[in-house]
Amino acid sequence: MTQQGAALQNYNNELVKCIEELCQKREELCRQIQQEEEEKQRLQNEVRQLTEKLARVNENLARKIASRNEFDRTIAETEAAYLKILESSQTLLSVLKREAGNLTKATASEQKSSGGKES
């Protein structure tokens, strides 16, 4: 019976040792879970912050693109109006030169005809 008692005591000791090892492994696993949950929370906060920042950047970008489009439209309209002014100025200059030439010819003709009659 003492042998059986000794064997039972050995089994009991081994069982206790195995249970303690399992408890230690469980505690280590709990620490790892806690660390990973903290890391997960940290990453979720970073993602939330980055998402908010991305939304702000997108809003700013949309406003700036709209402003750039307004600049493009204004520049295009101004350039078109300026080209019309240039064309009108060129036409006006041509008409003015032609009329000035006609007036010069008319004045020269009048001077010739009045100069010839008086002589």
UniProtKB/Swiss-Prot annotation:
UniProt keyword terms in alphabetical order: Acetylation, Cell cycle, Cell division, Cell projection, Cilium, Coiled coil, Cytoplasm, Cytoskeleton, Flagellum, Neurogenesis, Nucleus
Q: What is its main location?
A: nucleus
Q: Which GO terms describe its cellular component?
A: axon; axoneme; centriole; centrosome; ciliary basal body; midbody; motile cilium; nucleus
Q: State whether keyword Cell cycle applies.
A: yes
Which GO BP terms sit in this record?
Answer: axon arborization; axon extension; axonogenesis; cell division; intraciliary transport; microtubule cytoskeleton organization; microtubule nucleation; receptor clustering
Location of the protein in the cell: Nucleus; Cytoplasm, Cytoskeleton, Microtubule organizing center, Centrosome; Cytoplasm, Cytoskeleton, Microtubule organizing center, Centrosome, Centriole; Midbody
Could you tell me which residues carry N-acetylthreonine?
A: 2
Q: Which cysteines are joined by disulfide bonds?
A: none
User: From the Swiss-Prot or TrEMBL record, what is one GO molecular function term?
Assistant: identical protein binding
Coiled coil (UniProt feature): 13-70
Region named Important for localization to the centrosome: 2-32
> In the UniProt record, does the keyword Magnesium occur?
no
Describe the protein's quaternary organization and the partners it interacts with: Self-associates to form fibrils. Also forms dimers as well as monomers. Interacts with SPAST.
Describe the function of this protein.
Microtubule-binding protein which stabilizes dynamic microtubules by slowing growth and shrinkage at both plus and minus ends and serves as a sensor of microtubule damage, protecting microtubules from the microtubule-severing enzyme SPAST. Induces microtubule branching which is mediated by the formation of long SSNA1 fibrils which guide microtubule protofilaments to split apart from the mother microtubule and form daughter microtubules. Plays a role in axon outgrowth and branching. Required for cell division.
The record's comment on protein family reads: Belongs to the SSNA1 family.
PANTHER family assigned to the protein according to its UniProt record, in alphabetical order:
MICROTUBULE NUCLEATION FACTOR SSNA1 (PTHR28661:SF1), SJOEGREN SYNDROME NUCLEAR AUTOANTIGEN 1 (PTHR28661)
Q: What is this protein called?
A: Microtubule nucleation factor SSNA1
* Gene that produces this protein: SSNA1
